[in-house]
């Protein structure tokens, strides 16, 4: 079978399943064996979409590194808008790999910045990712500086949707311990006026924690009850479910916390 046969089989069984991923990886091997760059790119693009939903960032990173090399080689046609959009996925996920140094992370983000400038894209996504990374790395002064750049940068079609932007703002306020402001920022998400495929799924866990910190146990419980239904057993929402576990332990719901933790451990790829 050639690469396209494997990709067709993956589509038949469902690309965003473990079996689908296995077949896509077979497609990549077949394409590389035949030195078929176009098929190899198409298969890796398919793999990136599948692993994004399945929570497999390492596979995603390896596929993207190859795709970027082909993009820079300029041997085949590549949709730069699509590839640069996927750059955001990789950049946000790379901080979770302990084996990747800060210098390597900085190099990747500098490359992203230069490519965005080259295509005359807004740097708003770049500065937002930098802000989120500084939050993850415990660099409060950098967080403040980078957020100012994020807020000041112009918007364009490479920006995330309004619901995702609001979600990130909620996380920013929670990071700074301003729980009331986090809740206030989230009103449009709680009401459903702003939503997308990932939000408020990503937001409910941190909101449960924020409400608990504010002493509103009823609202916190409601966020868990409604929110976990959206994210239960889904690998792409493991971080949100980790927030729910934190909420359950903070509120001393030990049995429920253990139940959720055990269920989500089974989801890990």
What are the residue ranges of the model-derived segments?
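Helix-turn-helix repeat elements of alpha-solenoid scaffolds
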Residues: 13-26, 55-69, 97-111, 134-149, ...
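Solenoid-like repeat scaffolds
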Residues: 29-36, 68-77, 111-121, 148-160, ...
